């Protein structure tokens, strides 16, 4: 294995599917696609206008591309008065939990449960462009509900999302897949993004903790303690047992002038490894630009780290 091929394993998750509704979900790059009923299911095309079809013949890469979204263009309810979901045991959705699946050349595997899930990264939001369309679990997306899309959590599941920059948190019900834009951890509904201050900026640094409603008294994990210090945003490019490989990578990154390069020794599952990171980075836009430069060097996609 070449020295630069070490790094972190790809995350995991599921797909969408289905039929039942009246709107076709737009791709995250674009436009709604309508398909004749008989073209996929072998039924009469006369009923096609009455039924929803998620066109599975299209590659996932055409369905989920990160583009600009928009806020509501009509009256906006008072987000402060909206009620957060109460976590409860629900059956696993028949749709949206296929595992593994591939989007934009990257493979994902659906987690069996939200229990123990605790990740930090970048949150984005999706709003008006998807409002009223089917989610991956074939529910109707409501941007005024406290919901979210995850590439790895099972559908449906619950999580507490905390904005690490201001300490605000919200309980969300995960019922959709995404985001598949590089460096994103979770997509929040418009309401959830407003509740914790991700909107109007559009992105933010968050911690996502899975909720297990099967464990009485432990349904709601406490939000993390947020200090006044602004959380640091980094890109982890590799972690190596061989220190020479780590040092070579660090030198290559420094020569490319991608930003401050940090090399540190850490314990991972009882093993001592040397970690190579770029950062801290000033904001999400800078992280996206640096990530693209690193991939352009022929290196694996770096992983976002928030400390």
Can you say where each PLM-predicted feature lies in the sequence?
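Sec-dependent bacterial lipoprotein signal peptides
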Residues: 1-19
């Amino acid at each position: 294995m070449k020295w630069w091929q070490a790094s972190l394993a790809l995350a995991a998750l599921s797909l969408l599917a289905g039929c039942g509704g009246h709107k076709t979900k737009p791709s995250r790059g674009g436009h709604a696609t309508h398909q004749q009923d008989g073209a996929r299911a072998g039924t009469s095309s006369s009923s096609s206008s009455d039924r929803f079809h998620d066109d599975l013949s299209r590659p996932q890469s055409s369905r989920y591309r990160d583009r600009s979204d928009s806020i509501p263009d009509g009256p906006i309810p008072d987000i402060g008065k909206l009620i957060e979901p109460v976590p409860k045991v629900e059956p696993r959705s028949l749709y949206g939990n296929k595992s593994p699946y591939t989007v934009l050349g990257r493979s994902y595997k659906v987690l069996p449960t939200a229990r123990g899930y605790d990740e930090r990264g970048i949150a984005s939001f999706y709003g008006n462009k998807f409002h009223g369309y089917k989610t991956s679990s074939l529910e109707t997306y409501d941007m005024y509900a406290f919901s979210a899309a995850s590439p790895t959590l099972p559908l449906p599941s619950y999580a507490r999302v905390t904005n690490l920059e201001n300490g605000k948190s919200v309980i969300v019900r995960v019922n959709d897949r995404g985001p598949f834009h590089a460096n994103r951890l979770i997509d929040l509904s418009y309401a959830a993004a407003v509740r914790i201050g991700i909107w109007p900026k559009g992105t933010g640094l968050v911690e996502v903790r899975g909720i297990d409603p099967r464990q009485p008294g432990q349904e709601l994990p406490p939000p993390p303690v947020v200090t006044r210090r602004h959380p640091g945003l980094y890109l982890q490019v590799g972690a190596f047992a061989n220190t020479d490989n780590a040092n070579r990578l660090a030198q290559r990154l420094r020569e490319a002038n991608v930003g401050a390069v940090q090399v540190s020794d850490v314990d991972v599952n009882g093993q001592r490894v040397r970690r190579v990171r770029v950062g801290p980075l000033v904001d999400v836009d800078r992280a996206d630009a640096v990530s693209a430069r690193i991939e352009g060097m022929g290196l694996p996609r770096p992983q976002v780290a928030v400390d």
